[in-house]
From Swiss-Prot:
Gene3D superfamilies in the record: Ribonuclease H-like superfamily/Ribonuclease H
Reaction catalyzed: Endonucleolytic cleavage to 5'-phosphomonoester
Binding sites annotated in the UniProt record for Mg(2+) 2: D10, D134
Coiled-coil residue spans: none
Annotated residues for binding of Mg(2+) 1: D10, E48, D70
Physiological role: Endonuclease that specifically degrades the RNA of RNA-DNA hybrids.
Keyword Cell wall biogenesis/degradation: no
Family in the record: Belongs to the RNase H family.
EC id: 3.1.26.4
Keyword list, A-Z: Cytoplasm, Endonuclease, Hydrolase, Magnesium, Metal-binding, Nuclease
Protein name: Ribonuclease H
UniProt keyword DNA repair, yes or no: no
């Protein structure tokens, strides 16, 4: 039987682009594991993606996951848009390269061994786990230590 895991995620960017961070909280039964990291120059969408990626990549066995994000970009992208992006060779409907393709591909790989149900929660609306992830993300953004090597200025 697979483990039932809840994941909560959030990304933050101080300026967009600017210093950014992600926060994630993994919960299995009574155990919780917070994750966060800060990047010197990135975007809010990249940090939202990184939160989900980091959390999923932390799981060591196949799991049934409920992943809660306040990012419609992440939820819509992974449940809907990604199918056509892949069919078109990672191009949008108007034949432009998909933004953040490095992270979309990494997220696509990260979900393969798990059963993931994506849930959207309204950000900054008092959802306790989302608020905790927001605090982790903002703290990480305020003290960035990493380079987002995939970030490309437009």
């Amino acid at each position: 039987m697979r483990k039932q895991v809840e994941i909560f995620t959030d990304g933050s960017c101080l300026g967009n682009p600017g210093p950014g961070g992600y926060g994630a909280l993994l919960r299995y039964k009574q155990h919780e594991k917070p994750l966060s990291a800060g990047y010197r120059l990135t975007t809010n969408n990249r940090m939202e993606l990184m939160a989900a990626i980091a959390a999923l990549e932390t799981l060591t066995t196949e799991c049934d996951v409920v992943l809660c994000t306040d990012s419609q970009y992440v939820r819509q992208g992974i449940t809907s848009w990604i199918h056509n992006w892949k069919k078109r060779g990672w191009k949008t409907a108007d034949k432009k390269p998909v933004k953040n393709v490095d992270l979309w591909q990494r997220l696509d790989t990260a979900i393969q061994r798990h059963s993931v149900r994506w849930e959207w929660v309204k950000g900054h609306a008092g959802h306790p786990e989302n608020e905790r992830c927001d605090e982790l993300a903002r703290a990480a953004a305020g003290a960035p230590t990493l380079d987002d090597t995939g970030y490309q200025a437009e």
